[in-house]
């Protein structure tokens, strides 16, 4: 149905009680370099994208997600 698998099933999870400790879900919104994916790739609505961005930043500060991935 969707070309991008992220668009298919993560929109509902963002609406539910998602918090910064759900690293397995939040890592789906981060690329291989550790950058937050844009809305056009995630398929989220504006309010959902802002929530995910805020939670990813909180998880980074809490050292649950890295700021940069794979940099030598």
UniProtKB/Swiss-Prot annotation:
One of its GO terms (molecular function) is small ribosomal subunit rRNA binding. Gene3D superfamilies: Ribosomal protein S18. InterPro entries: Ribosomal_bS18 (IPR001648), Ribosomal_bS18_CS (IPR018275), Ribosomal_bS18_sf (IPR036870). Keywords: Chloroplast, Plastid, Ribonucleoprotein, Ribosomal protein, RNA-binding, rRNA-binding. GO terms for biological process: translation. It comes from the Eukaryota. Signal peptide: none annotated. Its main location: plastid. GO terms for cellular component: chloroplast; mitochondrial small ribosomal subunit. Pfam families: Ribosomal_S18. PANTHER family: 30S RIBOSOMAL PROTEIN S18, SMALL RIBOSOMAL SUBUNIT PROTEIN BS18M. Part of the 30S ribosomal subunit. HAMAP family: Ribosomal_bS18. This is Small ribosomal subunit protein bS18c. It comes from Emiliania huxleyi. The gene is rps18.
């Amino acid at each position: 149905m969707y070309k991008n698998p992220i668009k298919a099933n993560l929109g509902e999870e963002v609406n539910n009680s998602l918090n910064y400790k759900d690293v397995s879900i939040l890592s789906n919104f981060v690329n291989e370099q550790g950058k937050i994916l844009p809305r056009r790739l995630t398929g989220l609505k504006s309010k959902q994208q802002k929530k995910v961005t805020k939670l990813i930043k909180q998880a980074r500060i809490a050292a649950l997600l890295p700021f940069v991935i794979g940099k030598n």
